[in-house]
């Protein structure tokens, strides 16, 4: 069973993503902020990380950049799920280590296909 770390500060969004993933037989661990997400990523070694961009404290871009700095987390693929859909945001996200950028709203299928495309 593949393990996915969900980092999302909005509880209802986090619960929706968790539901989508559990419906598709993924093991889900979650954090409501980037600092806790960093700790869980290093400890749990998920197969993929799904994160929001707009979060209080450390935002999603900075979170992704930090993940790519540390040897324990640098190889973990990252999917960003966000309402920020400007091309500039996508380009900046790619520079910070985001592998796939999904804009809200998205479907369960969109999310699962994104995971399957980067986790082998």
Tell where the protein language model's regions lie, with residue ranges:
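Charged docking surfaces used in two-component/phosphorelay signaling
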Residues: 15-23
């Amino acid at each position: 069973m593949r393990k996915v770390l969900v980092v999302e500060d909005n509880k209802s969004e986090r619960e929706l993503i968790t539901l989508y993933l559990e419906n598709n037989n993924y093991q889900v661990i979650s954090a409501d902020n980037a600092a806790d997400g960093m700790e869980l990523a290093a400890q749990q070694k998920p197969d993929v990380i799904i994160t929001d961009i707009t979060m209080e404290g450390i935002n999603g871009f900075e979170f992704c950049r930090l993940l790519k700095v540390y040897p324990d987390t640098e190889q973990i693929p990252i999917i960003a799920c966000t309402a920020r859909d400007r091309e500039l945001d996508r380009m900046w996200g790619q520079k910070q280590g985001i592998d796939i950028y999904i804009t809200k709203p998205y479907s369960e299928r969109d999310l699962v296909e994104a995971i399957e495309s980067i986790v082998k």
